[in-house]
């Protein structure tokens, strides 16, 4: 995930604002910095899959809530520090990023040698559960974004991007997966 975010940045392709934290001693400092700019942030291990060890720190939450559909935990800052921070000890480096808003989209892309053959945007019924259903949408902005990703990464074959929008209504790439979701 870290190398993908760095390449997205290099290619000027939108991705969430993020910080890499590679040791526990810096985590509180970086969380405080991100929370000053964003009211809600996401903390996730750079190498996890399927929402494992993903925390959403939100000022809108009192206590914590474990999602029924995923392993995601939404928590206030105090509960994160007192109850959950230690669970990430072996998960460094961590990605701290702005929390994006729902809905989530999958961008299915079929490409050959950096040329798009087919790009299909799908809007998820449930942002946290990609296989819980979707509707195909005709979103020209997402299709253009897919073309740029295919070209810049010189992709060949079938790929899936996870996309959500920021608070300024701009699409942000969360992941590029070499397979359909």
Regions found by a protein language model. Give the residues of each.
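Phosphate-binding site of ATP-dependent enzymes
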Residues: 68-132, 136-147, 164-172
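Amphipathic alpha-helical regulatory segments at dimerization interfaces
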Residues: 30-33, 148-152
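Short secondary-structure junction motifs
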Residues: 15, 38, 91, 156-160
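ATP-grasp fold ATP-binding core
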Residues: 8, 34-59, 88-102, 119-122
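Conserved N-proximal alpha/beta basic substrate-recognition cap immediately N-terminal to
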Residues: 1-33, 48-51
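Short catalytic-loop micro-motif centered on adjacent basic/acidic residues
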Residues: 16-19, 42, 95-97, 160
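Glycine-rich phosphate-binding loop of ATP-grasp-fold ATP-dependent ligases
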Residues: 15-18, 40-78, 106, 125-135
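Conserved metal-phosphate-binding beta-hairpin within the catalytic cores
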Residues: 109, 153-181
């Amino acid at each position: 995930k870290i190398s993908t975010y760095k390449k997205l940045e290099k290619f000027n392709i939108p991705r969430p604002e993020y910080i890499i934290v590679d040791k526990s001693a810096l985590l509180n400092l970086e969380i405080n910095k991100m929370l000053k700019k964003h009211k809600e942030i996401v903390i996730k291990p750079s190498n996890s899959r399927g929402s494992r060890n993903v925390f959403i720190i939100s000022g809108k939450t009192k206590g914590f809530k474990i999602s029924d559909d995923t392993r995601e935990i939404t928590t206030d800052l105090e509960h994160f520090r007192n109850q959950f921070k230690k669970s990430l000890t072996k998960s460094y480096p961590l990605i701290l990023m702005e929390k994006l808003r729902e809905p989530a989209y999958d961008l299915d892309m079929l490409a050959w040698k950096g040329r798009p053959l087919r790009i299909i945007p799908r809007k998820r019924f449930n942002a946290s559960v990609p296989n819980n259903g979707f509707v195909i949408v005709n979103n020209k902005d997402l299709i253009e974004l897919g073309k740029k990703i295919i070209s810049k990464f010189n992709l060949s074959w079938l790929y899936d991007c996870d996309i959500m929008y920021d608070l300024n209504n701009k699409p942000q790439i969360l992941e590029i997966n070499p397979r359909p979701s």
